[in-house]
Amino acid sequence: MTQPKLFLDMDNVLVDTLSVLNEIAMRQQSVEKPDQIPGIFRDLPPMPGAIEAVKQLATEYDIYVLSTAPWQNPSAWQDKLIWLQHYFGEDNTSPIYKRIILAHDKSVAHFGGGILVDDRPYHGASDWDDPDADSIWLQFGADPRLTWSNELVSFLLDVSQVQDVTDTLREAVAVVAERGHFYVHGDKTEFDKAHWE
């Protein structure tokens, strides 16, 4: 059977972005938005457990990275690719080799179905909750157990197995979420952003 598609956001899912940018925003009054600092995205630390999780999930999923970058920071686009190559490799042994999508509207990629793991509902992430496309948005950390260092990997591995016997990927997510009493995502319209976002 064909492997299901898994799309992973970078910021606050693979990369520990927000904690670093919030710290910079509190220290520096000269910067309106810390995400516009050239080079800022190149050296951010990975989220705990993220690198190992991607490698493990690549055995069950076709994995893609789906992220956005600030329009006012052209280096961010290149820096994100450099970050991914640093942690996952630059050749065809990488689980994400030539599977990187950078777009301001993440909904453009959902029509082929799949799961998007993203921490925030905006930039088209919540549009992935679409039964017609058999796509679903799983909000990273909305349920504190659904993080890399907790139960997210086992949740996604279970979804992959259940998907083999259900009609849709969305149904598989629903079955696994119900079985473990997982909260898949929060409110799609109300979300507390950092003060500088």
Regions found by a protein language model. Give the residues of each.
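Short catalytic/ligand-binding loop motif for oxyanion handling, primarily in non-cytosolic enzymes
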Residues: V15-L18, V65, Q72-A76, V108-F111, ...
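Conserved Lys-Pro-Asp/Glu-containing loop-to-beta segment of HAD-superfamily phosphomonoesterases
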Residues: K5, P95-W128
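A short, structured active-site edge motif that brings together acidic residues
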Residues: S67-W71, W77, L81, Q85-H110
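Active-site neighborhood of HAD-like aspartate-dependent phosphohydrolases
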Residues: M1-L44, P144
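Substrate-recognition element of Asp-dependent hydrolases with the DxDx(T/V) motif
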Residues: P45, A50-Q78, L84
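Hydrophobic/aromatic residues located in beta-strands of well-ordered beta-sheets
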Residues: I63, I100, S135-W137
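Non-catalytic pre-domain segments flanking phosphatase-related domains
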Residues: M1-L8, E171-E197
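Acidic, Mg2+-coordinating phosphoryl-transfer loop and its flanking beta/alpha structural elements
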Residues: I115-Q161
